[in-house]
Amino acid sequence: STLMRSSAASDVYKRQEIRRFLLTLGSHRHVSALARLFNGSKKESLKHDDIMPVVMACLNMGKQKVGALIVIEHNVPLDEVVRTGELIDAAINQRLIENIFFKNSPLHDGAMVISKKRIKAAGCILPVSHDLNIPKELGLRHRAAMGISQQSDAHAIIVSEETGAISVAYRGQFYLRLNAEELESLLTKEN
């Protein structure tokens, strides 16, 4: 029994190490292809009806200068990130998103993860990018968004607490100061 538990734990650890190794290889397209190979077929992409509550919540939070960090998982699983936060598993809902990021909410400082058309978790901790080319005026939310975009194929949406500007980190690139149409277009673009 102890030997079986040890073997199972070793197997889980090896899978995590292999996944980490694959995430560090090559371009994001190669990572996505390898992730699909290990995790099955490509995940269903989010459509207009799925994205609009996120877009509207970001617009409202931007107007009120409420900071937010929302990560939308695609093909590379973010299970390790989800485990760092509080599990929610709720339908994507504008009001829920806004309430989670409300300044006095216990989950407002971390990232929200959306996966399989559901809000999976909030208050999650993301890897921070140490890229020296990130402009100094961009804060920790932007560095965390860039970090997850460099390690996965996820979209990471940032709402700046200081300016209210909405930006996205995707495939290691920033898309800054987006309006509603630009945000929706970027989020519904195929991987």
Task: Label the model's feature ranges.
Residues 1-9, 13:
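Single conserved hydrophobic/aromatic residue that forms the stacking wall/gate
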Residues 17, 21-191:
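Divalent-cation
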